[in-house]
């Protein structure tokens, strides 16, 4: 068993009051310019460019628990339970569970938003619907338990995986 390591990471707040959030790449770039940091004891080494999200949304307590910090990373790292912090064009970021990525399983079945037309002939190389319209990611937003979000990949600016959940002692 490894010893716990004391690590200092940026701490960002994620709450229902997201009107103050910048959308797109601007928010992602400001994470590491943040002046608010937290020291945590990690059981394992965290990937580079990790940061903590202080989740204040009561609907997320079911998943994260009370007095926790969700640790995300903007590096290419496997997501814990397929949970991501997702940045969208012209909308505030959200935390969600990736249910399906249609761009990864291209050609493995029927498209979600397929519209039959006379041009859908098996031998045809031309489709009346642009391929980019088929590249959707389906998320279950953790702050909206009833909601599923279908998002075109072209509308996603970034997707940071959840790498660790830190429980704060009070």
Identify the residue ranges that each predicted region occupies.
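A short pocket-lining beta-strand/turn micro-motif at the edge of beta-sheets
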Residues: 94, 133-135
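Structural motif
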Residues: 68-69, 82
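Short, compositionally biased
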Residues: 58-61, 82-104
């Amino acid at each position: 068993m490894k010893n716990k390591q004391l690590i200092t990471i940026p701490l960002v707040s994620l709450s229902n009051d997201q009107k103050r959030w910048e959308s797109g790449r601007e928010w992602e770039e400001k994470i590491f310019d943040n002046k608010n940091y937290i020291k945590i004891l990690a059981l394992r080494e965290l990937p580079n460019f990790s940061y903590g999200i202080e989740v204040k949304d009561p609907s997320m307590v079911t998943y994260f628990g009370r007095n926790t910090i969700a640790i995300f990373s903007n590096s290419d790292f496997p997501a814990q339970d397929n949970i991501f912090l997702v940045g969208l064009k012209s909308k505030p970021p959200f935390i969600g569970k990736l249910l399906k990525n249609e761009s990864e399983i291209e050609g493995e079945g029927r498209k979600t938003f397929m519209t039959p037309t006379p041009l859908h002939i098996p031998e045809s190389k031309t489709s009346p619907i642009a391929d980019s319209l088929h590249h959707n990611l389906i998320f279950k937003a953790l702050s909206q338990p009833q909601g599923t979000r279908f998002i075109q990949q072209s509308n996603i600016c970034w997707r940071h995986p959840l790498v660790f959940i830190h429980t704060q002692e009070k």
